């Protein structure tokens, strides 16, 4: 079945090359749609943009219902360090409560992401689809998932918690779920150069 919602995207570019991205989702109130996993954007960037510098929760991966053991701080990491080889391939590497995120090459050139409110982000050399094989799970292991030839970045207003608070299959607690409805998210992408 098709998703019953409208998504409006607005891109505003200033004279310095910064792009303000605003996405607004208007849900069909009559639709019966399950909870959403995330609300945000995904982009494929050149694989050479493999350096991460951000101010948010870290240094380990953390999610809305699993971030109380992480500290707010300024962290420098690589894209390779974001992937955790769980026994079964799955979502990994997300950071929460981010104030700003820089995705650059080793020379310091790339993009900076900022928003008016804290956001979540991740950067992996894997597509989301390669880490989640859908409802019917295959017998495979993380080390068998091939790397993509790009850096896959997700920048999210909100992402559902992991759940599993009383068993492996438990849904997240109510406050960490993303119910189908209207959402709006804006962020700014700014080009950064090491010589500026």
Question: What residues fall within each predicted segment?
Answer:
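Beta-strand/loop-rich accessory regions of lumenal/periplasmic or secreted enzymes
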Residues: 1-196
């Amino acid at each position: 079945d098709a998703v019953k919602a409208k998504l409006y995207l607005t891109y505003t570019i200033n004279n310095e090359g910064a792009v303000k991205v605003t996405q607004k989702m208007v849900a069909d109130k009559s639709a019966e749609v399950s909870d959403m996993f995330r609300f945000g954007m995904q982009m494929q960037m050149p694989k050479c943009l493999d350096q991460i510098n951000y101010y948010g929760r870290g240094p380990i991966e953390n999610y809305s219902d699993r971030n109380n053991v992480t500290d707010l701080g300024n962290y420098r990491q690589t894209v390779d360090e974001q992937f955790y080889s769980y026994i079964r391939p799955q979502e990994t590497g997300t950071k929460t409560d981010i104030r700003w995120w820089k995705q650059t090459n080793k020379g310091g050139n790339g993009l900076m992401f900022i928003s008016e409110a804290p956001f979540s982000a991740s950067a992996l050399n894997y597509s989301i689809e390669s880490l989640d094989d859908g409802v019917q799970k295959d017998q495979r292991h993380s080390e068998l998932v091939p790397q993509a030839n790009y850096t896959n970045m997700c920048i999210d207003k909100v992402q559902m918690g992991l759940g599993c608070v009383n068993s492996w299959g438990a849904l997240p607690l109510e406050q960490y779920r993303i119910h189908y409805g209207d959402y709006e998210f804006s962020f700014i992408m700014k080009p950064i150069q090491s010589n500026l």
